[in-house]
Amino acid sequence: MKTTLTCGLTLIGLSAGISSADIMSISGGIDTSIEQTGVSFDAMLDYNYTGGTNGTLTIEIANTTAEAAIGGYLTGFVFNILSSDAAASAVLISGTNTSFLNTGIENAAPFGTFDAGAALGANWTGGGNPNSGLGVGNSGTFEFSVSALDADLLSSSSFVGAGEHFAVRFRGLDDGGSDKLLAPAPGTGAVALIGLGIFSRRRR
């Protein structure tokens, strides 16, 4: 299935409001999924230090599943905070999809426990009807308030690591199944290039 142009333009438009150069792009697909269903996602992370022990993390994430027969909804994502502060936290303060709620510390089986995230019903495993998630070709923007003693030293990569620190959940696939993905090692780049590239490379 051809990824909708609306989705690509939406993410590019959202990216226009990001002023920081510290932007990281990540993605996940069949190579990093548990069930290898073919679902996929692309995301951009932007961290900004705001003063004291505080910062703001903005995550733009899209369901880029390419095959219409797969279907499904992106229903949650979680991440770790690679901080020297063991009490570091990130709390969801806004999102374009209001069905996504703050998870806090979440057991995202089978990957383990993560520091923060957002999911339908604040639940990685369930969370109610998956139709409230991000369908194929749709994206959402979520903003987290970050608190850490070393907030001034954090960057966008502090929430991804080599990829194993960011996980995404899909439910409601057309065959009734679900899947869970980790992000592979991320890359960085200019906002405009990321916005164009992450969608065009999956068009069929």
Predicted regions mapped to residue ranges:
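Positively charged n-region of N-terminal signal peptides that target proteins for export
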Residues: 1-4, 200-204
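A short, hydrophobic C-terminal helix/tail in secreted or cell-surface proteins
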Residues: 184-201
